[in-house]
Amino acid sequence: MSDAQALGIKNSNEANGALNGSYASVSVGSQTLKVPVIIQPGQAKGTVGLSFGYGERLGLEDEMQTGVNAYALYANFKNVQNVEVKLDSGEHEFACVQLHNTLMGRGDIVKETTLEVFNTKDKAHWNLMPQVSKNHIEFDVTSPEVDMWQEFDRSIGHHFNLSIDLNSCTGCGACVVACHAENNVPVVGKSEVRKSRDMHWLRIDRYYSSATTFEGDNQTKEDISGIGDSLNTFGEMEKAASNPQVAFQPVMCQHCNHAPCETVCPVAATSHGRQGQNHMAYNRCVGTRYCANNCPYKVRRFNWFNYPSYRKFTEVNPAQDDLGRMVLNPDVVVRTRGVMEKCSFCVQKIQTGKLVAKKAYRPLVDGDVTTACSDVCPSNAITFGDWNDVESDIRKSSEEKRSYQALEEIGVKPNIWYKVKVRNEVNEELVEIQTAHGHGESHGDEHGDAGHDAGDNHGDGGNHDLDTGHGNGEGDHQPSGH
């Protein structure tokens, strides 16, 4: 039994998926704080985690005063305290939209291996080619001989790509904040987030393993036989392990070369540019939301309201304040109600970089253009640049043997790369499973070349949203796992 169960602390979901949680009283000596509880797997038994940085009162309006000051319990600045936790009255409404926490064996989305396997085995063992089923037989995905898309020579001019190293990503969220600031992404407030109306152009999917390791999940899925076994096993795989592995995966618009959003827009509001970007023409968009329905990555966002001016959002959207409007980026249009929006690869920064190079009478060189997310990433997990520049960091990154593109089997050919996560740990289970893998040694050292010159780009698959934190910070603490 977990600590949360023993204390009677629960998290529950409303019909629309919105997350609610119990309150608890946390006491150290004579100091007691009433805080909401969000239950997370992997929390060590007998411990709680309490967030600092909330509870500020001075200089803030009432609606901005959120949470409690946890420093009251931080006696003598000791990380370990003798804490008493009790169930308290009330129910807290969390702004958390990441409700499905496990991959359930979909290892082609977040790929990982151990350092031992990485150093001793061919990439066919740990960076497997995705497969599709034909007549109940699995086949490696290859570029189709017949393609109904009208292709053009992508080697002419610039072709911008982005690479994300899952080894380096810590899930800190700096990229999400930078994206909001750079692209005037509206702040919608806690109640809208609970309705899954968040506007993040970039989210960070957080996954827990349902077995000891993610590769263990994949093996469990492979061992499933029959409908009955499938229902029972997948039901169990929805639950995270008590001591799971954790992986973070930033997900934004993949700027697919064969973008499914472009083919369904009835007014051609979204289209593909020669530089590899999927563009949005806001003044053409009529808000059908067909593009969002047809996006396999769920990265498009719809403006349900006119967030920058509607009085309902005055308390949560700083852009409605005279001072707050001064931080809006004048190079990016502020969208209005009924318009779809998404990641643009910071097209305004690309155009600025090209203009600077033009005024200097020189060609664009690697490093001239960056995105907001790649600029601020503290671990340098995000690389951006011109893929057609053979000496660029992005070209070299995409051609590394760790590079892959998730969901490449659906054939949308995106311009986002991910790198296999390598864990520096002793994991006999993972070594045994991946040593047995290797359904073909041909995942291709020239994966990057095929990705563009032959039109063999691929795709990503995190279908969750970021734990947004709009109003989610009232001293949230985490008792032990489920």
Placement of each model-derived feature along the sequence:
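Short, flexible loop/turn elements at secondary-structure junctions
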Residues: 3, 28-30, 41-43, 54-56, ...
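Beta-propeller domains
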Residues: 157-160, 164-166, 170-186, 192-209, ...
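Iron-sulfur cluster-binding cysteine motifs and their immediate structural context
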Residues: 174-193, 203, 258-284, 290-310, ...
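Flexible glycine/proline-rich, aromatic-decorated loop/lid segments
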Residues: 199, 303-322
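Long, compositionally biased charged/polar accessory segments in the mid-to-C-terminal portions
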Residues: 320-323, 338-452, 460-467, 473-482
